[in-house]
Amino acid sequence: MKFFQAAALLLAMFAALANAEPVPQPGTVLIQTDNTQYIRTG
């Protein structure tokens, strides 16, 4: 069950990021820290 909760959380996070950020380009890196997640392209 923990796995499914983690997967659902990741899906929700990616959905929120997709709404807040432009479409990620190839080579995009998802940076995750204790308090923030953000996308860095490069």
Swiss-Prot record:
Isomerase in keyword set: no
Keywords of this entry: Amidation, Immunity, Innate immunity, Secreted, Signal
Propeptide: 21-26
Tissue: Hemolymph (at protein level).
Record GO cellular component, one term: extracellular space
Record's signal peptide: 1-20
Keyword set includes Signal: yes
Highest taxon of source: Eukaryota
Phenotype seen when the gene is deleted: Adult males infected with spores from F.oxysporum or F.verticillioides display reduced survival.
Modified residues (Threonine amide): T41
Biological process, per Gene Ontology: antifungal humoral response; defense response; humoral immune response; innate immune response; response to bacterium
Inducing or repressing factors: By bacterial infection (at protein level). Induced by Gram-positive bacteria M.luteus (at protein level). However, another study found the peptide was present in both immune challenged and unchallenged controls (at protein level).
Location in or out of the cell: Secreted
Role played: Peptide which plays a role in the humoral immune response to a subset of filamentous fungi, including F.oxysporum and F.verticillioides.
Extra information: 'Daisho' is the Japanese term for a matched pair of samurai swords, one short and one long, and refers to the role of the two Daisho peptides (Dso1 and Dso2) in defense against fungal infection.
Official protein name in the record: Daisho1
Organism for this UniProt entry: Drosophila melanogaster
